[in-house]
Amino acid sequence: MIANVIAEAKLKGACGRIDDVQSVASLTELMFSPQGREFCQNTKFLRVDRLNHIADEAEENNVFIGKRNVLTTSHKSAFIGSKGRVLCSGTEAIYNIIVADNSHVEIVATNYAVVMVTSINGTYNITKDNTARIL
């Protein structure tokens, strides 16, 4: 299953790091890298119809494909054709959130959280306290 996604990414011009991808976990890790986010933005690669067959395994890595009513506190999460809420709190790491393919995400940022949002044909609303920062 993952081989088809890798082959399509190569055809669309993914960076050389795609050659190191052996699993959905390593694919999702690459997706959150600066190069991965740029590739996904430029090619609109993150689509439900392209990735639905890896949805269950992707969800184990906080990548939600075609899901509803998702609630997560993960520092890295992606929503692809999904709806959900991300609760961001604290300074342990920067929250990296990808919102793609008509997803809608509510982001709640508190307690000095730093949040980076990448929107690829998705929408999001942010509620934050005076300490949180959005990049």
Regions found by a protein language model. Give the residues of each.
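Short, glycine-biased loop/turn motifs at secondary-structure junctions and
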Residues: M1-D101, E106-L135
